[in-house]
Amino acid sequence: MTQFKLIGFDLDGTLVNSLPDLALSVNSAFAEFDLPQAPEDLVLTWIGNGADILIARALAWAKAQTGKTLNDEQIKALKRRFGFYYGENLCNLSVLYPNVKSTLETLKQKGYLLAVVTNKPTKHVQPVLQAFGIDHLFSELLGGQSLPAIKPHPAPLYYLCGKFGLYPKQVLFVGDSKNDILAAHTAGCAVVGLTYGYNYNIPIAESKPDWVFDDFAQILTILE
C-alpha cells in the first residue's frame, strides 16, 4: 500500500462518457424554446462547472448564433426542461470509459476507500453509478448540491479528509479537468489528470497534475 488511503474521482469525463446524453438533453430543451441545436463537440466545452453554468454557456452560444435571448422566467423554465430530459436520459447513450469498472473493483479489493466528487446535480449521481453497477464500490458520493461549494473550491476534498480522518496527503484525486486539478492542489492532495475527458479542449497537462494518464487503468501503477 502507498501513502494513499482514499481515492476520489470526478464523474463526467473521468468515469463516464456522459457527453451524448448531456448534448441530447440540452438540444431537447432548446428545441422547446426554438433555440438552435448544438453539436456534441461544442457541448463538450460547456461541461464541468455544473448544470447552471452549462445552460448559461449554451444560452450565450445561442444568443451569438441567433440574437435571441430568454427572460429570467424562460431561463428557469429551460433549466427545468433540461433537468427533466437529463433525468430521462441519464444513461441512454452514456458509457463507462475503458477499464473503469475493473480498476475500481481492484482498488476496492486492495482496501482503498473510494469516493465520487462531482459538480453534477447530486440527485443524478447515485442513479448513474447504479446503472453501471458500480455504486456499491464507493464510500461517499458528493454532487453539486452536497456542500456549499463545488470544485474548483477544495471544500469537497476537505470534507472527505474530515469524514474519514485523513490528511490531504493520504487522498489521491482523479479527474479530467482543470477544476479537478485546482481543487486537489489547493486542498494539498495529489492528483491524476486523464487526457480523454472534458477540459474545454485544453490539454490536461497544462493544469500540471502530478500524473497524466491516457488510460484509467494506469492509476494502478502509482499504487503498487
From Swiss-Prot:
It comes from the Bacteria. The active site is at D10. Its EC number is 3.1.3.18. Mg(2+) binds at D10, D12, D176. Pathway: Organic acid metabolism; glycolate biosynthesis; glycolate from 2-phosphoglycolate: step 1/1. GO terms for biological process: carbohydrate metabolic process; DNA repair; glycolate biosynthetic process. It catalyses: 2-phosphoglycolate + H2O = glycolate + phosphate. InterPro entries: HAD-like_hydrolase_sf (IPR050155), HAD-like_sf (IPR036412), HAD-SF_hydro_IA (IPR006439), HAD_2 (IPR041492), HAD_sf (IPR023214), PGP-like_dom2 (IPR023198), PGPase_prok (IPR037512). This is Phosphoglycolate phosphatase. It comes from Pasteurella multocida (strain Pm70). The gene is gph.
